[in-house]
């Protein structure tokens, strides 16, 4: 983010900057329903609604946490060591319509940041699709938001945050607090819950690829608000971030398809959608630091590397259902590290990457930030997951997973065609069974 210190000024907010950030906030909020469609199309028919619900309920849960204390802890004055903010603005206390953050109303800035927190939590759900206990997810999201997302956001963007102000690593729009935290958390929960029934044995292809493409399109559209909005103003930096976002999404798509064509002999719609997202993930931290040429390379590298990374789960035996690790963790690492290579003074205001004579110093700072955030996130998320699994169970029962979480947890099906799953007839005994196991969810 361009502005990291909360300020209050007598001057009025700039109307142009405010109008742009209002639009950007709405665009980023749209990304969560887009993600729901993207994920919903990738799962099997028996768990579509559950996947949608995990994203939509995250909107409500994270919003409440953010308004009560999350914003204050993330963006309030540093409480010491650059680790966490204070509770001065708990319940949004002291933030009225006249409060200004830079050139925009503070309440708008807080809402913009809220939309980032929402989609980050929702992203994690893709790693545990088809097998997570819904009631456990309702507890996990607020706890994870407070213990993982909020501190990391303060480190990167908050007043006095240690990554930005002491280490000197750069992250324009969320490679560390959004992409790497969601990916590392997804990996941790994969290990806590274990693989789906039939992993590496049964075909688990996306059930609705047009739905996946629609979701990817909405994500791409919203990403312009995500990245260009992080300039916090209607200015040249926002324009550069906007164009870099478009460029990296395109080369990410092409890079993934190139690998598919060479490796598998055919480009796929799933590959196109995933490649675009991989490029967008990688440009998120770097869109305000690299030139257009750098953005093209960042997207291409992410698309190609992530297309290989999504297959690691079969070799290493972790079931990352919807490739959160392969796309968001790997893509986030690629984009964050490449700042140290392609950063230009004209974009950053001073910092230069290796390619432009800056040496290895900035690359080293980026690497330290990546390592610390990934390790902290993985460790804390794994601990939360293990605790919830012990206290209330984090994994759905085998009966729920076999029948499908839509019917057994939500008492609904996405497609009311008299069939459940891949053409399997619905037994009359399924509905009573669903009502019985619903009490366990």
Language model features: what each stretch is:
Residues 2-441:
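Glycine- and aromatic-enriched membrane alpha-helices
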């Amino acid at each position: 983010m361009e502005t990291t210190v909360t300020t209050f000024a007598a001057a009025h907010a700039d109307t142009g900057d405010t109008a742009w950030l209002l639009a950007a906030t709405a665009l980023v909020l749209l990304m969560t329903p887009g993600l729901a469609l993207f994920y919903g199309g990738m799962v099997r028919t028996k768990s579509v609604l559950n996947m949608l619900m995990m994203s939509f309920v995250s909107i409500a849960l994270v919003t409440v946490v953010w308004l009560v204390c999350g914003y204050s802890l993330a963006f309030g004055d540093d409480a010491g060591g650059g680790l966490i903010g204070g509770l001065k603005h708990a319940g949004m206390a002291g933030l009225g319509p006249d409060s200004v953050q830079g050139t925009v109303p503070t309440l708008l800035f807080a809402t913009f940041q809220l939309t980032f927190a929402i989609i980050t939590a929702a992203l994690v759900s893709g790693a545990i699709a088809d097998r997570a206990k819904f009631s456990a997810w309702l507890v996990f999201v607020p706890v994870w938001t407070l213990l993982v997302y909020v501190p990391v956001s303060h480190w990167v963007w908050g007043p006095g945050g240690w990554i930005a102000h002491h280490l000197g690593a750069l992250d324009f729009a969320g490679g560390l607090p959004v992409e790497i935290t969601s990916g590392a958390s997804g990996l941790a929960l994969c290990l806590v819950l274990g693989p789906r029934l039939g992993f590496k044995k049964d075909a688990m292809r996306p059930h609705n690829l047009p739905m996946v493409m629609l979701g990817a399109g909405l994500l791409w559209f919203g990403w312009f608000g995500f990245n260009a909005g992080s300039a916090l103003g209607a200015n040249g930096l926002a324009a550069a971030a906007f164009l870099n976002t478009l460029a990296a999404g395109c080369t990410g798509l092409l890079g993934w398809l190139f690998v598919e064509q060479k490796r598998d002999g055919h480009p796929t719609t799933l590959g196109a959608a995933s490649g675009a997202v991989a490029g967008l993930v990688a440009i998120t931290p770097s869109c305000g630091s690299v030139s257009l040429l750098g953005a093209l390379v960042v997207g291409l590298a992410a698309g190609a590397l992530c297309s290989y990374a999504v297959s690691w789960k079969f070799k290493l035996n972790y079931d990352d259902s919807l490739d959160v690790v392969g796309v968001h963790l790997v893509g986030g690492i690629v984009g964050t590290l490449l700042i140290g290579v392609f950063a230009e003074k004209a974009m950053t205001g001073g910092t230069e990457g290796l390619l432009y004579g800056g040496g290895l110093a900035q690359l080293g700072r980026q690497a330290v930030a990546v390592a610390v955030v990934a390790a902290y996130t993985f460790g804390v998320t794994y601990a939360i997951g293990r605790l919830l699994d012990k206290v209330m169970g984090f994994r759905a029962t085998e009966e729920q997973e076999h029948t499908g979480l839509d019917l057994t947890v939500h008492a609904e099906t996405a497609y009311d065609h008299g069939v459940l799953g891949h053409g399997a007839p619905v037994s009359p005994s399924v509905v009573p069974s669903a009502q019985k196991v619903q009490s366990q969810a």
